[in-house]
Amino acid sequence: TIVTDAPLEFAPQDNLRKAPSDALYPLFMRLEFTKLIDKYGLKPPTDVPAAEEPVDLTVTAEAVTTAEKAEEFLALFRKAEHVTLLALPDLSGVIVDCDTSENAAVSAEFYFNRYESDWNALLRALFSDDIKKVSHNVKDLQRTLLENGLPIEGFVFDVALAGYLLDATAGKYDIASLFAAYFHQTLAEPKHLEPEAFSMLGDTVEAETAFHVYTSAVGALYETFAPELEKRELHELYYKVELPLCAVLARMEHAGM
């Protein structure tokens, strides 16, 4: 016999399925559950304190198409303490962000199919030692430069390498993953890396926007990682061993070793 009147403290409303809370946002970001964040419409909780007060910064983007204008920017880059540089995998496009004052910066974009002068001469200047560059995945970029007979000098920081030293268990060190882990924000899709992004078949505006966003993200990661390396006393390991090793490995890979 089934007893149907057994005492049981239960209210159906207590078992209602509740919508995920925004409190899950940091956890989902750390676990890279970006699709679940989008599915549930989660947003960063408002009670999470910002790492620092936002700074007003005016950034002027400019497409550089002539050798004369390029030389103006190269002179600016050479005077800077450092610039943030991001290149397309095939070197057909480069964006360089450079601070011009405490609250102003310029973002110069260079594209092979729009540049009216010697593209390789421009690349030789950009990747020479007199321009101090912050970038991402420096070893791979240096190998590509060597394959094209270009210099590999002047790299002073690699955010992917720094991300690895700061957390060797993260597993992913692409720009979007690093940005999500440290800033709890999801970057837009890297449209600039799609095969036809800058062709007539692609959405050039979306690709250019993404290219600028990811370059800015590299700069933001540098501002976070550089002091963190100092705090953890990793300065010597990073600047004296790991970063110089990038060029050594790039040359070995280029030589087929």
Question: Which ranges hold each PLM region?
Answer:
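Generic surface-pattern signal
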Residues: 4, 29, 33, 42-45, ...
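Short, structured coil/loop segments at alpha-helix boundaries
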Residues: 21, 30-37, 42-46, 115-120, ...
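Conserved DEDDh/DEDDy metal-dependent 3′-5′ exonuclease domain
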Residues: 62-229
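N-terminal functional modules and adjacent low-complexity/disordered segments of proteins
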Residues: 3, 28, 52, 83, ...
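Non-catalytic nucleic-acid-binding/docking modules located in mid-to-C-terminal regions
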Residues: 1-59, 149-156
